[in-house]
């Protein structure tokens, strides 16, 4: 039961952070392009890389804390379901080039963010 509560609490925090990121970036950059979704996926992937790197090298958190952060907070913060919807909306608006660029940039930057997080921790603990 502790594990479920940890994931639920983290998921709530992550979802609120995602929402606030969307509101903030929407005001700053506009909503014609899905900047908020790409931002949460890239930064969330970077954070996942940092946490995974820490867990592999220097930090052994309790299973509940690990689940709270990685499954809950980051699971609620990042979102590929919204990513898929954003792609579909761009395609349906006829913005095929923007949709393709969004898919490529999101994938490359998210995976790159994870590797950057891992590299940061590997360098810091070396």
Curated annotation (Swiss-Prot):
Q: Which residues bind Na(+)?
A: 75, 78
Q: Where in the cell is it found?
A: Cell inner membrane
Cellular compartments per GO CC: plasma membrane
Extract the InterPro entries matched here. Answer: FluC
What is known about regulation of its activity? Na(+) is not transported, but it plays an essential structural role and its presence is essential for fluoride channel function.
How is this protein situated with respect to the membrane? Multi-pass membrane protein
The text of the family note is: Belongs to the fluoride channel Fluc/FEX (TC 1.A.43) family.
Name of the molecule in the record: Fluoride-specific ion channel FluC
* Lineage, highest ranks first: Bacteria, Pseudomonadati, Pseudomonadota, Alphaproteobacteria, Rhodospirillales
């Amino acid at each position: 039961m502790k594990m479920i509560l940890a994931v639920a609490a983290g998921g709530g925090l992550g979802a609120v952070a995602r929402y606030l990121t969307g509101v903030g970036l929407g005001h700053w950059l506009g909503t014609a392009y899905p900047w908020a979704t790409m931002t949460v996926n890239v930064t969330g992937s970077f954070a996942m890389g940092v946490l995974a790197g820490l867990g592999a090298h220097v930090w052994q958190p309790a299973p509940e804390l690990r689940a709270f952060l990685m499954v809950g907070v980051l699971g609620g913060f990042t979102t590929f379901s919204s990513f898929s919807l954003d792609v579909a909306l761009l395609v349906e608006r006829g913005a095929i080039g923007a949709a393709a660029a969004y898919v490529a940039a999101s994938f490359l930057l998210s995976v790159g963010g994870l590797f950057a997080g891992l590299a940061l921790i590997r360098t810091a603990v070396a």
